[in-house]
């Protein structure tokens, strides 16, 4: 089959992984989102900002070697429940949609 890229921009981690179906291997890169000292969590606007800053670095690291993609997948919401929504997921989903369109490969949402 080939190489499948997964993108996840949930509330606390920016994550990329490529699964190779030929040798059943996974290469991944991820960065935690910074939470200010003494704070319990992140506002969605801060999470979106940090994902936007971290995604290019992760892509540069993961794709330092030429990897041909056969499909792209991205998380789009925290749960499958109707109406489930968090803005931080739009960061990864937007990048996945762009890659799918530019590369002409299928987009899967989860």
Which stretches of residues belong to each language-model region?
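Short acidic/glycine-rich loops and adjacent helix/strand connectors
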Residues: 1-110
């Amino acid at each position: 089959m080939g190489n499948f890229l997964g993108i996840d921009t949930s509330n606390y981690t920016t994550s990329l992984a490529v699964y190779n179906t030929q040798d059943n291997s996974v290469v991944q890169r991820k960065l935690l989102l910074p939470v200010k000292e003494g704070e319990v969590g992140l506002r969605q606007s801060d999470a979106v900002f940090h994902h936007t800053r971290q995604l290019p670095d992760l892509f540069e690291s993961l794709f330092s070697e030429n990897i041909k993609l056969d499909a792209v997948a991205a998380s789009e919401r925290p749960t499958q429940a109707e109406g489930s929504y968090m803005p931080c997921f739009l960061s990864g989903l937007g990048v996945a949609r762009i890659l799918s369109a530019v590369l002409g490969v299928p987009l899967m949402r989860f």
